[in-house]
Amino acid sequence: MTFLNDWFEWNGERSTAHGVYVLEQPPVTMPQERSKQTSVPGKPGSLTTLKGEDVYDDLTLTATCFIRDPARIPEITAWLKGGGTVSFANRPCGFYHARVSNQIPFEKILRGNPHCSFAVNFRCSPPFWYVSNPEEVTITTSSYVLVNPGSVYSEPIIHVYGTGDMTLIVNGSFVELEGIEDSIVLNSVIQEAYQGEMLLNEKMDGEFPLLKPGNNLISWTGDISRLVIAPNWRYLA
């Protein structure tokens, strides 16, 4: 017998395709802010110093699983390794970037029964990425307000269509673009500017744009015909 929440996906492959079924899903977990606690002589409590804005420690999310056929263990161990993306049946709307972070012991459930149970620990890097993101948002007029529905800043990929020298302004932060021919991509995820396979970092001056939760004012000067944005909305939990 199987249940609706008996799976997870690792690098796009569902666990049930490998004969792995989930007995217990990891709970939805809020990550912890990365901070330093300092005791202050003569005062109660401690002083908290944040180590950056919107910086959070990794989460360890554990899926407790079982398999019916131990002969598939070599196949499973070849699949469950390294890094990639993980999503869970109790939260199929998105994914984490993660690594498998534990040795996986396969233990027999009952003597004489071939079923084996095991736990997989995924060390997840917050935030949680929504898969229901709009693929693209097209903006054709300056002074446009783009609303980030997430709970943490996003790292967008912005395709700027235009020619010559221009300035992109996101929430008051300026990105100067010089000598552009037709278009340029500003990829805030990988911190690179390019067109196709050609790097164009030398044509950009300024910080790669981020989109904060809530309203984001986007405007420009110069010959920009449109922006096409992959927003990459994200959530803390």
Q: Model-found features: residue ranges?
A:
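Polar/acidic, low-complexity leader/linker segments enriched in S/T/G and N/D
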Residues: 1-39
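Oligomerization/assembly interface segments of phage tail-like spikes and tubes
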Residues: 39-69, 114-128, 216
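"Short basic amphipathic alpha-helical interaction patches in structured regions
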Residues: 74-81, 112-114, 135-137
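Intrinsically disordered, low-complexity segments enriched in serine, threonine, and glycine
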Residues: 130-237
